[in-house]
Amino acid sequence: MTKHKYQRIARLYDLLDLPFERGRYRPLRRHLFEGLSGRILDAGVGTGRNIPFYPAGSRVTGIDQSPAMLERAARRLARIGGDVELRETNVLDTGFSDDTFNAVVASFLFCVLDETLQLPALHELARICKPSGEIRILEYRYSDNPRKRFIMRLWAPWVRWAYGAGFDRNTEHYMPEAGLEIVETRFLHEDIIKIITARPIQGQS
């Protein structure tokens, strides 16, 4: 279902996201890739909004299950350049070998995955991340502030209809079972957007 949504909205996606991209997301993307090097997976690359922030000298693979979104990413890559491979595949079964990547990054990916898909997706990312590597996940959550939470609840039906996304995913809950140890969780925008940093638990990925 989500794949079909993104096939449908791909040509409008950047326009729909433009106010948030300019006012909120761009600084967060810098944080997401800060200090990373080597082989990096951008899981859920979408239209390629992260491409300008890929670390110099790194080899990045961007994956997405929507050909239409990847087409937009390819156009952006052609303008910007870089050592980037774009591949159509599913985060639940990427097709990569064990221990392939030094780092795995996912920005606003897990909020579009149903609750039942959280664990298998995390397990797959843990499998393809090197034991010495790390996984960084940028995600929304409901605010603890009653007023902000109320506003987010008003927005939630539209966000679910347009993007297949939700603010109520319990991604962190599944990490230990997926073979991941949470290293750090911190908010990057108020108390609604956080970055979760995790690493494979030795012998469990």
Enumerate the language-model features and the residues they cover.
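A short glycine-rich, Lys/Arg-flanked "PGG" loop and its adjoining helix->strand segment in the class I
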Residues: 119-131
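A short SAM/SAH-binding and catalytic strip from SAM-dependent methyltransferases
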Residues: 103-117
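Short alpha-helix
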Residues: 163-179
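Conserved class I S-adenosyl-L-methionine
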Residues: 1-36, 49-50, 151-153, 158
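Core SAM-dependent methyltransferase catalytic element
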Residues: 183-205
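Class I SAM-dependent methyltransferase SAM/SAH-binding core
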Residues: 39-94
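A short acidic, Gly/Pro-enriched loop at the edge of an enzyme's catalytic core
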Residues: 92-104
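Conserved beta-strand signature within the Rossmann-like core of class I S-adenosyl-L-methionine
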Residues: 132-140
